[in-house]
Structures are given as structure tokens and as C-alpha cells.
Amino acid sequence: MLKMGVLLFTFLVLFPLAMFQLDADQPVERYAENKQDLNRDERMKIMLSALRQRQCCDWEWCDELCSCCW
């Protein structure tokens, strides 16, 4: 009887839950699809603004953890 309960629980509860798409995944996918429609100049503008936001260390405090010094 226990085996049948485990089997029913697996197929009636766990298996259907694995088939649902998570809501958290959908906005990211839509955002990626929207980015494919941008022209080259708009994509370059987004990339350059993201690169400018990166912080760099000063030369006095440069060590192996700082990526801009190397």
C-alpha cells in the first residue's frame, strides 16, 4: 500500500509540478527576445553604457583582484 501511495504522489503531484514553466523565467525570455529586434547602433549604445558603469581601481591600490590594471 505504501508503494502505491508513493507512486500516486509522484505521478499526481510531483510530475505535473515539473511540467509548469516558472513565472520568473518568462520576463527574462521576453527581454532577450526584445533585444534581438534592436539595430546595431542601439545594441552598441547599450553595451557601451554597461561598460562605462564598471568601476576601476586607482593605480596606487592596484592588486591582482583588479581587472583594469592588467
UniProtKB/Swiss-Prot annotation:
Domain of life: Eukaryota
Tissue: Expressed by the venom duct.
Record keyword Transmembrane present: no
GO cellular component, as recorded: extracellular region
InterPro entries, per database record: Conotoxin (IPR004214)
Residues recorded with modification Pyrrolidone carboxylic acid: 55
Residue ranges of coiled coil: none
Leader peptide range in chain numbering: 1-24
Compartment list: Secreted
Keyword terms, alphabetized: Disulfide bond, Pyrrolidone carboxylic acid, Secreted, Signal, Toxin
Propeptide cleavage-removed residue intervals: 25-54
Entry's Gene Ontology molecular function annotations: ion channel inhibitor activity; toxin activity
Cysteines paired by S-S bonds: 56-68, 57-66, 62-69
Family from the record: Belongs to the conotoxin M superfamily.
Record's comment describing the protein's domains: The cysteine framework is III (CC-C-C-CC). Classified in the M-1 branch, since 1 residue stands between the fourth and the fifth cysteine residues.
Protein name as catalogued: Conotoxin Lt3.4
Organism this protein belongs to: Conus litteratus (Lettered cone)
The organism's taxonomic lineage, starting at the top: Eukaryota, Metazoa, Spiralia, Lophotrochozoa, Mollusca
